[in-house]
Design a protein with these regions (language model features):
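Short, polar/acidic, helix-capping and beta-turn segments at strand->helix junctions
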Residues: 1-107
């Protein structure tokens, strides 16, 4: 959703929409979530570099540490305000859901 220069990407899961499949591995799901988010941001004229806030939702909070390498790869020098919530998700195959807010041209 766009509101001026703000881009809101709602909870995004690790589904690969080209194949309608989802990995059973949280690291792979995290990478796919971020690919899906990057695509949505690009369609809105934005990018990962513009992300100012991110929320992670995981059914099993102990798995979050496994996601760090992928998150560092995507966010690199971007340091958005972040929060992690431990909560069930709509589909038991989902191991992580990520939501971001971006401000276009914030870099």
């Amino acid at each position: 959703m766009l509101a001026g220069d703000w881009v809101f990407v709602s909870g995004t899961t690790g589904f690969d929409y080209s194949t309608m499949t989802i990995s059973s591995d949280i690291v792979e799901q995290t990478g796919q979530c971020l690919k899906n988010i990057a695509s949505a941001l690009q369609q809105a004229g934005s990018s990962i570099a513009d992300v100012v806030r991110v929320t992670y939702v995981l059914p099993d909070a102990s798995q979050f540490e496994r996601c760090y390498p992928v998150l560092r790869e995507y966010f690199n020098d971007v340091r958005p305000a972040a929060m992690m919530i431990s909560s069930g998700l709509a589909d038991p195959r989902m191991l992580i859901e990520i939501e971001v807010t971006a401000l276009k041209n914030s870099t």
